[in-house]
Design a protein with these regions (language model features):
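Serine-hydrolase-like catalytic core of hydrolytic proteins
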Residues: 16, 50-234
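Flexible, acidic loop-helix segments that line cofactor/substrate-binding pockets
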Residues: 234-240
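Phosphate/oxyanion-binding loops and surfaces in catalytic or ligand/nucleic-acid-binding neighborhoods
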Residues: 20, 228-229, 244
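Substrate-gating cap/lid region and adjacent catalytic-acid/histidine neighborhood
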Residues: 192, 205, 240-267
Length: 267
């Protein structure tokens, strides 16, 4: 993949880099591959969130790097930089990797590391579980794993060492880091983890044993969404929800703090 971007005074920045195709609603994302020139001059859309901003086509990341290798010849791995993949906060219902406070240019230039900030699906689009084997939730966490996969496959071209990735985040990002530590899908994809707050960012929210099961999460998060979309009695609830107006899904479930279930990261 080739990208068109720009540099600031002390680092290069690649904005709005697609790491996954537009995801199927309530389906798991896969890494994006392309040999076409991709513009990386502006941030990609944030993920759909209240009050109705953003898009479901939102799986973009941003790369800030102090060093770009010459990719026309074999890359000197000794010159590659350590990588921080930063996961934004926002209670799993808001925020994006393009929020100004997550701009990684200063850290890249002063810390001599590559900084990656990511979007991931939020609210019901990222975490709504159905109490069946078809749609088990945690699509937002799966997006984070997909971002890790993309970074591992491509970050050398941006000056980063795929074998030296640290995952980090604050608030919901810190919860994500803890969840990824317990996710089999993320094993071996990073070398260090740095949760930068407690589980909620503001106060103690209990132990990891308090993460709900899929059944508990479905009862709390899914019931109001099914009711609002008239999908409660559908033969296939997931198909019904996929056809529903995204704004209706958002308004029904977008303010409910998703209950991340470690169990559902195992599907």
């Amino acid at each position: 993949m080739f990208t068109l971007s720009f540099r600031d005074r002390l680092s290069f920045r690649f904005l709005g880099v697609r790491y996954a195709p537009k995801p199927i609603r309530f389906g798991y994302s896969t890494p994006f591959t392309s040999s076409q020139l991709q513009s990386a001059l502006t941030y990609g859309s944030e993920c759909l969130q209240l009050p109705g901003v953003g898009s479901e086509d939102c799986l973009f990341l941003n790369i800030f790097t102090p060093y770009l290798p010459d990719t026309s010849k074999p890359i000197n791995v000794q010159k590659l930089k350590a990588v921080m993949l930063y996961i934004h906060g926002g209670g799993f219902i808001g925020g994006s990797g393009s929020d100004p406070e997550y701009d990684g240019g200063n850290m890249a230039s002063r810390g001599d590391i590559v900084v990656v900030t990511i979007n991931y699906r939020l609210g019901p689009f990222g975490f709504l579980p159905l109490n069946n084997s078809t749609a088990r939730g945690n699509y937002g966490l799966a997006d984070q794993v997909t971002a890790l996969d993309w970074v591992r496959a491509n970050i050398a071209a941006f000056g980063g060492d795929a074998n030296r990735i640290t995952i980090a985040g604050q608030s919901a990002g810190a919860v994500s880091v803890h969840a990824l530590l317990g996710s089999p899908q993320a094993v071996g994809k990073y070398i260090a983890a740095m949760p930068m707050s407690n589980l909620g960012g503001i106060g103690p929210l209990g132990t990891y044993a308090s993460f709900p099961s899929i059944e508990e999460g479905s009862a709390i998060v899914t019931t109001p969404v099914l009711s609002a979309t008239n999908c409660s009695n559908a033969m296939s609830q997931v198909d019904c929800l996929r056809e529903a107006d995204g704004q209706v899904v958002l308004q029904a479930g977008g303010s409910i703090l998703p209950l991340v279930s470690l169990i559902s990261t195992r599907v």
